[in-house]
């Protein structure tokens, strides 16, 4: 049962419909402290209609409200505070979580509508750095959240698999590379060749000319050039997939930049037909002055198309292919202007579906407030960070529980999960500092702390033995359980909020609050005591385990049963 709706209904009856249930729902608040009740309604929203002081309205409402199902309803100043019947509430919430299991919190907001999500998008022949983490894990969590409320997410890894760098790479490979080296370690060796090309071309400018020729061959469909390009792409993708597997992420499409090579002419033709292309200093632009934006540069003076032309082709292709209800681009906030231009050009082309395109921006990962990189300025590789996190997790497991079965598997889940959780607990628009020792701690507001809380709940259930929970005996009178019960009830609303704000941090913060409340309850209660409420207490533990596990799943984090 949605208790907020119940509160709104009794208020609506008490004010004889002078305020709609929808308006009442929008005004109902959750008091910050439990002594002020579970819900509060500010009576001053009625003072204009009723021409009375808010305090008087609050007192009169308390007299009129049907208090059935509430422990009490009282006026405190201009507020009407509602205290829920704790036994009824615990019975309702626990039976709902127990019966629905991992489906608890599922909703039908999306009606099965398609939502392509452009995310991750590393460059071929370059390693995935920590810079790729945010787009990858935010995009994945949004996909899981959208799926929970019945959208159909389509995860697209828009690979950086085209550009003049491939001419350089082909030249470098032919001069200094070998098939064996590429197969043994594709990314690092391809990067090594590329770096050497730039070192050598300082004294050999003819290398640049050769690279341009090879890229021209690639554009013209030369068999050897295409074969090498495809091979570099495949070998790189194999390596990326190893990282994605560790993050438990799969994609529905790997269509990258190259896929749209034959789709850009249509865009320039359409812009021409609609009279939107204008010449400016030899280049072709779309004027976006009415949107307070700089002109969108469509084609350079040498006839080469640009990044935005490719993105226009991708947007049109995705609309035609998926008939999307929303289309998301999980890309850093430095690209905000680019996406404003993209939407404005599509709008000028007459495509109203451009309103359903959303840029999901995010901040940087920093170290000591500066952009994350090693002392030498080298990028920090994502795979190395995951390895280091797993080692730290392993060390802590050895200290806390050396006899744990499947230690390596649990350390992988905890280490990788810690890195993902730390990213997602931060509001995505904010930049945040990354310190691995802080991230992989089992205490504080961390992923391992939430995982450990789930494992603790599972341990209690194992100690209870093969207990068949009685769904008719779920009343808890213990006030220590109240905060945990209230948080369990808030899970569906949390999911809804995270989806509407495209904000996984809402779920991560919720998981931390639920874990804290449960651990406090655990410290104060004898859960396995044989008394009339033992069944209800174990039902609460089961419900916490289910909800913590599902919260972590929505973030792309595993929940080990033992730690």
Swiss-Prot record:
A GO biological-process term: arginyl-tRNA aminoacylation
Gene3D superfamilies tied to this protein: Arginyl tRNA synthetase N-terminal domain (3.30.1360.70), HUPs (3.40.50.620), Isoleucyl-tRNA Synthetase, Domain 1 (1.10.730.10)
CDD domains the record matches: Anticodon_Ia_Arg (cd07956), ArgRS_core (cd00671)
TM annotation in the entry: none
Motif 'HIGH' region boundaries: 122-132
Superkingdom, natural source: Bacteria
GO-annotated cellular components: cytoplasm
Localization: Cytoplasm
InterPro entries hit by this protein: Arg-tRNA-ligase, Arg-tRNA-synth_N, Arg-tRNA-synth_N_sf, ArgRS_core, DALR_anticod-bd, Rossmann-like_a/b/a_fold, tRNAsynth_Ia_anticodon-bd
Catalytic activity: tRNA(Arg) + L-arginine + ATP = L-arginyl-tRNA(Arg) + AMP + diphosphate
Name of the top EC class for this enzyme: ligase
Gene Ontology molecular function, alphabetical: arginine-tRNA ligase activity; ATP binding
UniProt KW keywords: Aminoacyl-tRNA synthetase, ATP-binding, Cytoplasm, Ligase, Nucleotide-binding, Protein biosynthesis
Segment forming the signal sequence: none
Quaternary data: Monomer.
Protein family according to the UniProt entry: Belongs to the class-I aminoacyl-tRNA synthetase family.
Protein name per UniProt: Arginine--tRNA ligase
Originating species: Ligilactobacillus salivarius (strain UCC118)
Lineage of source species: Bacteria, Bacillati, Bacillota, Bacilli, Lactobacillales
Gene name for this UniProt entry: argS
């Amino acid at each position: 049962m949605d208790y907020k709706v119940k509160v709104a209904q009794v208020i609506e009856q008490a004010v004889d419909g002078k305020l709609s249930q929808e308006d009442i729902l929008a005004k109902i608040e959750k008091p910050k402290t439990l002594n002020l009740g579970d819900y509060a309604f500010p009576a001053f929203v009625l003072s204009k209609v009723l021409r009375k002081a808010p305090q008087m309205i609050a007192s009169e409402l308390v007299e009129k409200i049907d208090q059935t199902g509430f422990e009490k309803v009282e006026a405190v100043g201009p507020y009407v505070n509602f205290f829920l019947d704790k036994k009824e509430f615990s019975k309702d919430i626990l039976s709902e979580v127990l019966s629905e299991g991992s489906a608890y919190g599922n909703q039908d907001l999306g009606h099965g509508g398609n939502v392509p999500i452009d995310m991750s998008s590393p460059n071929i022949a370059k390693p995935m750095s920590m810079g790729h983490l945010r787009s990858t894990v935010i995009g994945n969590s949004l996909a899981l959240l959208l799926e929970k409320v019945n959208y159909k997410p389509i995860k697209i890894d828009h690979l950086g698999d085209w550009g003049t760098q491939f001419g350089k790479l082909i030249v470098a490979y032919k001069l200094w590379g070998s098939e064996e080296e590429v197969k043994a370690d594709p990314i690092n060796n391809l990067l090594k060749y590329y770096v050497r090309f730039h070192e050598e071309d300082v004294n050999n400018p003819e290398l640049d000319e050769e690279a341009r020729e090879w890229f021209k061959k690639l554009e013209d469909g030369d068999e050897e050039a295409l074969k090498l390009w495809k091979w570099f792409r495949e070998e790189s993708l194999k390596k990326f997939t190893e990282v994605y597997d560790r993050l438990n992420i799969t994609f529905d499409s790997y269509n990258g930049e190259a896929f749209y090579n034959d789709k850009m002419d249509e865009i320039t033709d359409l812009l021409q037909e609609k009279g939107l292309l204008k010449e400016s200093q030899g280049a072709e632009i779309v004027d976006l002055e009415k949107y307070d934006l700089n002109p969108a540069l469509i084609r350079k003076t040498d006839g080469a198309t640009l990044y935005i032309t490719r993105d226009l082709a991708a947007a049109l292709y995705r609309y035609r292919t998926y008939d999307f209800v929303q289309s998301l681009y999980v890309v850093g906030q430095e690209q905000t202007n680019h996406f404003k231009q993209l939407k404005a050009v599509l709008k000028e082309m007459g495509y109203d579906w451009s309103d359903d395109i959303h840029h999901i921006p995010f901040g940087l990962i920093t170290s000591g407030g500066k952009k994350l990189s090693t002392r030498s300025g080298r990028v920090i590789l994502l795979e190395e960070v995951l390895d280091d996190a797993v080692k730290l997790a392993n060390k802590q497991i050895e200290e806390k529980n050396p006899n744990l079965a499947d230690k390596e598997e649990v350390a992988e889940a905890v280490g990788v999960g810690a890195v993902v959780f730390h990213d997602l607990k931060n509001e995505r628009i904010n930049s945040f500092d990354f310190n691995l020792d802080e991230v992989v701690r089992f205490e504080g507001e961390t992923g391992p702390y939430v995982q450990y809380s789930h494992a603790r709940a599972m341990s209690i259930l194992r100690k209870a033995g093969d207990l068949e929970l009685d769904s008719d005996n779920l009343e808890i009178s213990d006030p220590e359980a109240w905060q945990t019960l209230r948080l369990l009830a808030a899970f569906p609303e949390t999911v809804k909020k995270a989806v509407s704000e495209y904000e996984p941090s809402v779920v991560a913060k919720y998981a931390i609050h639920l874990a804290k409340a449960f651990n406090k309850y655990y410290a104060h209660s004898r859960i396995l005591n044989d008394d009339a409420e033992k069944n209800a207490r174990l039902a609460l533990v089961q419900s916490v385990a289910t909800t913590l596990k599902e919260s972590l799943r929505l973030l792309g984090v595993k929940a080990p049963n033992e730690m």
